[in-house]
Every structure is written in structure tokens, then in C-alpha cells.
A protein has these predicted regions:
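Conserved AdoMet/S-adenosylmethionine-binding subsite of the radical SAM
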Residues: 66-194, 199-206
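Local cysteine-cluster metal-coordination motifs and their immediate loop/turn environment
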Residues: 3-19
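A generic structural signal for well-ordered alpha-helical segments enriched in polar/charged residues
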Residues: 41-44, 79, 181, 185, ...
Length: 231
């Protein structure tokens, strides 16, 4: 992703990188040679100090899989990991909207940790809080996530509060029960539930309580799916 702004097809009201309109950039995605050189330089530096990374994460201020060279970036990251930090894992944090593209799907199958976003399955909530680009279809996303046959970690953010006079609490049964049904269909390796940890561009948002997150995580584990909760 470019360092000068944000490129994303979601415009989440809780995004720590701000609203898309406030972070527009004339710059394109980082090129493959630039990324490869930067990653190798960092790994060489870390290797010299004996402090190698546990995880190499492809994320950034936007949607990494939107990059036209995303599959090549994955291959380069795996190659450099194997050369300099063979014990490290390669992870991708994604909203999953490009995971139905064959080249992106294959690339996500190659990484160790394929983390895909699913905050809720309620279309109105998604439109109001996650604000994806036109054409987003939650049923299609669930089917795509299930197509990884377990090679997927679902990341779900829970929060409370209000925005523009509307309640944005997705910790209650109205949202959690259908979300649990979606997890059954997806069959992920694990689930990570968490809440906001930094300032958000939208005012009025609040953290989900540890008690709420623990309760949600317990219900996921009852499905036979490993689940972590971060406060």
C-alpha cells in the first residue's frame, strides 16, 4: 500500500487509518521490486541482531489483495521468509472481497494465516458501519470463505456506541446468532474477536466489553471452533 494515503474498497467508520475521503492519495500501489527490496532489507537488519519476526503480515492502510501484484507479493514474501526467517509465518489481513479471484484465492491458500473479515452478516449493519463498495454480497462472501475448506481465520470486530444517531452495537443476539450460523457454514480454522483499540474517525464509538467478547468467544468454541478474544 502507498505510505501517503489509503486505498480500500471498505470505508469502515472505525478504521484507524481514517475515512477514505480524508486519505486519498495520487500514488499507486507499491511496486513488487520496491516491496521486495524493503522486506529483504528489514529481514537482513533483523537477522543481524538475532531478532527475527514471528510473523510477516501483509496488510497496510487499505486492502492488500487489491494490489495488481498481490500474488507475486505473496510469493516474494514466502521466498524471503524461507531464506531469512524460516520459522516465521506469513499472514494476510484482508476484507476478503477479492478472494473470489482465482489468482488471489490461490495466493491466500499459500500463506500460513489467511485472516478474513466478517464483523456481521447483517446487510444493513454492513452498509452503515463497514461501508463496502457497491456490489458487496454477504452470501457470496460466506460462500467464498467456505471455499477455503478451513484454511481461513475469521476476524470479527465488535463494538458499541452510536454514530449519526444510530446504534452500532453488534454484540447482541440479533447480530451474533446469524454470525454464528455463518461460522458453521464457513468452518474456519479459528476465529479472532476483538474491539476498537485506537482512535476512530467516527465519534461516539465505544469498545465492546471484555465480558461481551468473552461470551461471544465461548459461543464460538461451543461450535468446536477455536476462538481468541482481544480487548
Amino acid at each position: 500500500m502507498p505510505a501517503t494515503g489509503k486505498i480500500c474498497n471498505f470505508d469502515c467508520i472505525y478504521c484507524e487509518n481514517g475515512f477514505n475521503a480524508d486519505r486519498r492519495t495520487p500514488d499507486a500501489f507499491v511496486t513488487l521490486p520496491t516491496l521486495r527490496e524493503a522486506l529483504e532489507a528489514k529481514l537482513v537488519e533483523m537477522s543481524s541482531t538475532g531478532e527475527l519476526p514471528d510473523v510477516i503480515t501483509l496488510a497496510g492502510n487499505g486492502e492488500p489483495t487489491a494490489s495488481p501484484v498481490f500474488p507475486e507479493v505473496v510469493d516474494a514474501s514466502i521466498h524471503l521468509r524461507d531464506e531469512y526467517a524460516p520459522e516465521a509465518r506469513v499472514a494476510v489481513l484482508s476484507n476478503g472481497t477479492y478472494a473470489d479471484r482465482p489468482d488471489v484465492h490461490r495466493a491466500l491458500l499459500r500463506v500460513d494465516d489467511n485472516l478474513l473479515k466478517l464483523d456481521t452478516v447483517d446487510p444493513d449493519y454492513i452498509r452503515f458501519v463497514d461501508r463496502p463498495a457497491k456490489g458487496y454480497d454477504i452470501e457470496h462472501q460466506i460462500e467464498v470463505f467456505a471455499s477455503f475448506c478451513g484454511h481461513v481465520i475469521i476476524q470479527s470486530l465488535f463494538l458499541t456506541g452510536t454514530w449519526q444517531g444510530h446504534d452500532v452495537d453488534n454484540t447482541g443476539d440479533t447480530y451474533v446468532m446469524p454470525w454464528l450460523d455463518a461460522l458453521r457454514r464457513i468452518g474456519p480454522r479459528s476465529v479472532a474477536v476483538y474491539t476498537i483499540a485506537r482512535d476512530t474517525p467516527a465519534a461516539g464509538l465505544r469498545k465492546a466489553t471484555p465480558q461481551s467478547l468473552d461470551s461471544i468467544a465461548k459461543r464460538v468454541r461451543a461450535l468446536g471452533i477455536d476462538c481468541s478474544a482481544s480487548y
